[in-house]
Amino acid sequence: SLKAAALGGESFFVNEFIAQEDGCTLGLTGNMLGDIEVIPVTDEFIVQSGAFVGSSGDLTLDTKWQGFTKGIFGSNLFMLKTVGTGDMFVNAWGGIIKKELQSGEKMILDNYQLVALSATADYRVTKHGSLKTTLFGGDALVIEIIGPGTVYLQTKNIMEFARALIPFLPQRR
């Protein structure tokens, strides 16, 4: 939708593919160097906007405001929310790990590691370290997720990948 495109970083065009006969295959690819995971959705799921590849079934895609802190210090200003029943396809940097959180169980991870989580889990961005680290280090905020819920995280970090490439880039003159 246009709303998802303007706010979620997705393409302004949503492609719809309809099989003309049984047994057809559709190939999907993401823009990140890593796995694509199929997540069965039966209610609501929250996904990083850059990780969303597509969906099937009766899923509705909408944007979900992350909040000021998450938008300023996080990797995306918006996350996407899927509502309904169907399969959601997500892409990640590296591999994708699925973690089931029990009620009250807590997981803390770097903002760049989150791919998706079920809406049954509570999440918030919290500061880790000093204010100086937060303002100048860029990696001082983490996501705290509290179960119950399902969390999908990626094994690689785009910011670490970008930092690793810097020594190989041509120098400005």
Task: Give names to the regions the model predicted.
Residues 1-173:
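Phosphate/adenylate-binding glycine loop and adjacent helical scaffold
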